[in-house]
Amino acid sequence: MAQHLLHGTLHATIYEVDALHTGGLRSAGFLGKIISNVEETIGFGKGETQLYATIDLQKARVGRTRKITDEPKNPKWYESFHIYCAHMASDIIFTVKDDNPIGATLIGRAYVPVDEVINGEEVEKWVEILDDDRNPIHGESKIHVKLQYFAVEADRNWNMGVKSAKFPGVPYTFFSQRQGCKVSLYQGAHVPDNFVPKIPLAGGKNYEPHRCWEDIFDAITNAKHLIYITGWSVYTEITLVRDSRRPKPGGDMTLGELLKKKATEGVRVLLLVWDDRTSVDVLKKDGLMATHDEDTENYFNGSEVHCVLCPRNPDDGGSIVQNLQVSAMFTHHQKIVVVDSEVPSQGGGSEMRRIMSFVGGIDLCDGRYDTPFHSLFRTLDTVHHDDFHQPNFTGASITKGGPREPWQDIHSRLEGPIAWDVLYNFEQRWSKQGGKDILVKLRELSDIIITPSPVMFQEDHDVWNVQLFRSIDGGAAAGFPDSPEVAAEAGLVSGKDNVIDRSIQDAYIHAIRRAKDFIYIENQYFLGSSFAWAADGITPEDINALHLIPKELSLKIVDKIEKGEKFRVYVVVPMWPEGIPESASVQAILDWQRRTLEMMYKDVTQALRAQGLEEDPRNYLTFFCLGNREVKKEGEYEPAERPDPDTDYMRAQEARRFMIYVHSKMMIVDDEYIIVGSANINQRSMDGARDSEIAMGGYQPHHLSHRQPARGQVHGFRMSLWYEHLGMLDETFLDPSSLECIEKVNRIADKYWDFYSSESLEHDLPGHLLRYPISVDNEGNITELPGFEFFPDSKARILGNKVDYLPPILTT
């Protein structure tokens, strides 16, 4: 049967199965007997039935009910689903299974042809359940379902941007959008005083950068009642204030000393740090994990700081195998700081306090402090002497010298009602995994800490509307509703037995669908939509990197090409994911990335051909990485030792170059809307039941790109980032949707790549933005950039390698 593109939202309800005669396909053949025997031997087989149903679009799993226990004949779920889709499919498939501790037993499948729903009519019917040979199962059971498909074109926000200040935010989410907020955006941990691009904003102002770690230092220093921190890693030995031109009282204290001091002053200091249980040797030796979790716990032992190492516990709904996967492979990845702070308008003498929060990509740990200059060698005797981070070379150390690994990252400070949502997230997580009930009871402080209220009037031109999004499940946060109906209204996805919040993915999908002119992304990873990958040496349905973001981006570009409207997507990723670039895990991730990009470029080139256009696909979708290269200066730090000869380390030191590690997790749409958080563009971050994540999405209602280009804080922030990456400002950068802009940015990045990769070096690199070193032909195939099979100074393949012995769940 012909496949159709389902691009939009599918509303589905699974009611019940009429009359099951259990046994299903279990007894079929030899394998069924083995499973039964194994179950009986280890005592699993005698239990009750645990029936659940799933929804697939072709071979992509898009929905699943909870389990119904001990209703073997007539399971009733009555569960509704709100499914974002961007899939080619001929059938919508409902599968009924009986769960057991090792896996699940197939009962049968029911098929609804996409032809029946594609026109948008509501379809409600009893559908026959079939076996693997498409024959009715024993007893001719049927499943009762309802479906209605809404194509993206029918969405009133499609291609419209944020139309007005009345835009309500992303629907079906746990946290609704908050008004009257204030947001500060940070490009990295620190911005020195000599980084001063002149970027005009609306109202005659110029953009002013903020300083993340200085602001966090001030927030912690000034807290009087509570300091709550979560991190993938928190390292007690770092200092937050390092700029000798901007000293602060107490700025030489380490983070650990500062937190202990605040706790002795009577402030409740609670830390939730991911308990790195992996010790999966395969990852450890690749340098992927070095979180200091045990050092941090030991440091605070016996102090008044409460530090809890929390593993990424699976929710109770998985099989034994799945639960082992979650606790061994996945992480707590949220990076937040929540404090009480003074109420600015009350003056210094007031006792009144409010809640302030920080959310983003920067962990409070080693290797994160950097500035927009991203020096490789010149800070090794100053701010990076005791914070030398270089996990991409075996045995790298300050005694052997640079290049250090520079760090590109993005963070935000949230004030107003939105800051309380970050607090609620912490309280939910502490209640689930923190152990003792020692959260500050804010109700008892209601005369001091003002309740969630706007920090700005809606009329104020600097005001923000902001919404909080997460990837998390009931294994990591308390307070999720039990009833499927209430969960569905809050946008929570029901799993077999767990409730999942995957609103970060929803927020990205929503923002991409709304986009009118351009999208700018910086992210540490870029892979997904594996249901649409070519079956080149893999079985795509085995990969399960099912999130929609890459496919949504390419379908948006295709739609604009078909309409003859201009639209551009710019993506910045690291050269390779942090770790030894030749290692199996890094090569596997690069392979997934190549497959993702190829899938997108094939969509784009096909659309161009269909319109008779012979254009470079990079004029629509373009990928970059960041790197730096510095000439040697007099008086530079001289290492006592040298790297081993003929190593990547030695070659990079001699060539005086290295990548700038892109750790950002950010998307800007049309210069009016921004998402900043901890979530990568991969399945781990977007799934909800894998890594736990948090993000904010916001806009300034007085600075929308409705009748004229947006010129608020989001625009200023993007221009400041481009100034950092390109080393210049240019008129054409004001309109990233124009052909002139994308051609100019591509041209500059191509030139900088030539400088970066050349044999000789006469000057510092004039900017950091480099083309991602791949070629795209006019059919969308991705091949090596001529002369570049390997990253400079390494033997690591740029296009990656398929690695069969690492399970995809680990690297996607």
UniProtKB/Swiss-Prot annotation:
Gene Ontology molecular function: calcium ion binding; phospholipase D activity
Comment on bound cofactor: Ca(2+) requirement for activity depends on pH. Active either under acidic conditions with micromolar levels of calcium (PIP2-dependent) or at neutral pH with millimolar levels of calcium (PIP2-independent).
Biological processes annotated in GO: phosphatidylcholine metabolic process; phospholipid catabolic process
Cofactor needs: Ca(2+)
Domain notes: C2 domain is a calcium-binding fold, and the binding promotes the protein association with membranes. A lower affinity toward calcium can be anticipated for PLD alpha C2 due to the absence of two potential calcium ligands.
Protein name as catalogued: Phospholipase D alpha 2
UniProt similarity note: Belongs to the phospholipase D family. C2-PLD subfamily.
Purpose: Hydrolyzes glycerol-phospholipids at the terminal phosphodiesteric bond. Plays an important role in various cellular processes, including phytohormone action, vesicular trafficking, secretion, cytoskeletal arrangement, meiosis, tumor promotion, pathogenesis, membrane deterioration and senescence.
Residue positions binding Ca(2+): 374, 724
